[in-house]
Amino acid sequence: MRYKKIESTYVIRLERSENVIEKLLEFCEKEKIKGGYFNGLGAVSEVEFRHFNLATKEYSSKKLAGQYEITSLHGNISEMSGKSYIHAHIVVGDSQFNSWSGHLGEATISATCEIFLFKLDGVINRKKDERTGLNLLDI
């Protein structure tokens, strides 16, 4: 991972074989980012989508492996139990122009991933909502 800071914005480039969520969490801990949002694009070789079922309060997942373009990656950064928390969604497309989308569980970079991350001043917290089973923003 390489990055550059311009005012309150970080321009991040993830490298081949790096995991998106893992690297973003490491980055936020290192830079002490407790609130923010990001968007990006690039290419992945593996991706795990997650979908939350409100009735069962459980996630199901779907994994893809191959060559996929990230056509949209966006999410936010908050803190839960004193640790960085990433909530991200992703859309990927294949060579036949099919696309898949959902909550991002994890993704492995195949070529590059270019992310613009905007740091907010202050802390945004999350807490578990017993009614839905989700970790919601505590605002």
Model-derived features with residue positions:
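N-terminal intrinsically disordered, cationic/polar leader segments
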Residues: M1-H87, V91-I139
